[in-house]
């Protein structure tokens, strides 16, 4: 049975889901499935992992590809992008509605202000472990981001 586009949009809205992001996720999934088939890579799911562990693993994988597009919560609903320290808000179309300490994002857009889109909450330590050369302290100017990284590295050493 084919579902009307309008019905899909209404269903997503009723659940607080972003239809654009779901389409993008479906497209990425189809591409990954196609690549695994093409290269004869078996797709294995560990049945012993809980749903929470699988989500964590997916987020850690996303950190591998998006560490350069990370940001930390600043204040008043704004985030600071990692290297540029540009202040931006989470785009209103995002399903992330509560402040998260660290996030990764797919794009930074300039409209009536600066917004980050396709946002995922992550842990700072995942970013530091994934890309230690990128998050090397001497490459950051003095400021909020550097202070957060110092605090993060101190926690990792404990």
Language model features by range: what are they?
Residues 1-154:
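Second RecA-like catalytic domain
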């Amino acid at each position: 049975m084919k579902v009307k586009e309008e019905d899909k949009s209404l269903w997503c809205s009723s659940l607080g889901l972003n239809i654009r992001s779901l389409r993008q996720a479906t497209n990425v999934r189809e591409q990954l499935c196609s690549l695994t088939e093409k290269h004869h890579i078996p797709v294995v799911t560990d049945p012993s992992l809980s749903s929470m562990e699988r989500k964590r693993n997916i987020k850690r994988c996303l950190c591998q590809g998006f560490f350069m597009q990370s940001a930390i919560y600043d204040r008043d609903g704004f985030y600071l992008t990692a290297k540029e320290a540009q202040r931006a808000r989470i785009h209103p179309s995002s399903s992330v509605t509560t402040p998260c300490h660290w996030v990764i994002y797919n794009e930074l857009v300039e409209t009536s202000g600066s917004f980050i889109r396709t946002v995922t909450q992550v842990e700072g330590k995942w970013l530091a472990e994934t890309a230690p050369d990128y998050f090397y302290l001497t490459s950051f100017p003095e400021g909020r981001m550097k202070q957060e990284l110092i605090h993060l590295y101190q926690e990792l050493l404990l």
